[in-house]
Amino acid sequence: MQLRKLLLPGLLSVTLLSGCSLFNSEEDVVKMSPLPTVENQFTPTTAWSTSVGSGIGNFYSNLHPALADNVVYAADRAGLVKALNADDGKEIWSVSLAEKDGWFSKEPALLSGGVTVSGGHVYIGSEKAQVYALNTSDGTVAWQTKVAGEALSRPVVSDGLVLIHTSNGQLQALNEADGAVKWTVNLDMPSLSLRGESAPATAFGAAVVGGDNGRVSAVLMEQGQMIWQQRISQATGSTEIDRLSDVDTTPVVVNGVVFALAYNGNLTALDLRSGQIMWKRELGSVNDFIVDGNRIYLVDQNDRVMALTIDGGVTLWTQSDLLHRLLTSPVLYNGNLVVGDSEGYLHWINVEDGRFVAQQKVDSSGFQTEPVAADGKLLIQAKDGTVYSITR
């Protein structure tokens, strides 16, 4: 078992564990796989790179760039937000959300969830339980709202609402126009959970979200009423680690089917209307996954990259040469699957057979959040804050 991020009451630790017990002095040591040797079939190149503040350091974060109307929006943990020209990376505007703390110092904003762009606004959440809406034109704050807890997942905008899943198990809907809280749903919290929350998926007027209690919930967005809940991960085992049941990945809804993935649980297909389980496969992960056509692509909790069928979750291929390299979530780009790792490499994988087709050293600080593919561009932000635009 591999554990990347752990939340204990009053204590945040970024850990890498193996074995069955959190407190076992004889636990096995997890070793990162050596960098695989790859004969590049093409040469990925960096079109441009731009520094955005000090990045996230060694803190858990869900900050990654967003692209809209040929503008890249990115942020760092301290509170710097920048808009960049997507063609050359040149700065259009920058603002700081850090608060003044005396004459010469500022209190960092601790941005953690985002970036999301929609309807002329840039949305970002913080560990200080603040959600910001910035105007895309100049970065000025359109509104700022205090929510129920740390906003660790990215804001999701749908049907005039901004949906926020907080670290204390609350799903909140804010008015897109002014940030007013319209409703709050309690998703329950166990005593111990992984640090990080599922961002909701939206479909047919419902918000579908994973919870730290091992359940997937569907909520009526208009009124905040619970439609159904379904457990996909059961808290079992003799240790606290074994009993972690978080569903921190974002569900994917396709043709009336909800696909959800738990950490110590299952990849599960659920009926959107009833929540009933259609099929399940024993797999675990904290990384978001992809449903494309008749395939599911994912990175499991041990950093195996896998392709499975959408009907039944049958394994099509598995790439096991990146074990314990702390991979990002995958992204599809130009017909290949791309993942980043903690040493700053991008790995390009053939979607048909799982073989490597290219490898690229990009950044020495490493990657934690997934690449973003949009409008023919591949963007990724390193832990030190540098944003890269990659082409092949």
Curated annotation (Swiss-Prot):
GO terms for cellular component: cell outer membrane. The keyword Hydrolase does not apply. It is a lipid-anchor. It is found in: Cell outer membrane. SUPFAM superfamilies: Quinoprotein alcohol dehydrogenase-like. GO terms for biological process: Gram-negative-bacterium-type cell outer membrane assembly; protein insertion into membrane. InterPro entries: BamB, PQQ_b-propeller_rpt, PQQ_rpt_dom, Quinoprotein_ADH-like_sf, WD40/YVTN_repeat-like_dom_sf. Keywords: Cell outer membrane, Lipoprotein, Membrane, Palmitate, Signal. PANTHER family: CELL SURFACE PROTEIN, OUTER MEMBRANE PROTEIN ASSEMBLY FACTOR BAMB. Belongs to the BamB family. Part of the Bam complex, which is composed of the outer membrane protein BamA, and four lipoproteins BamB, BamC, BamD and BamE. This is Outer membrane protein assembly factor BamB. It comes from Shigella dysenteriae serotype 1 (strain Sd197).
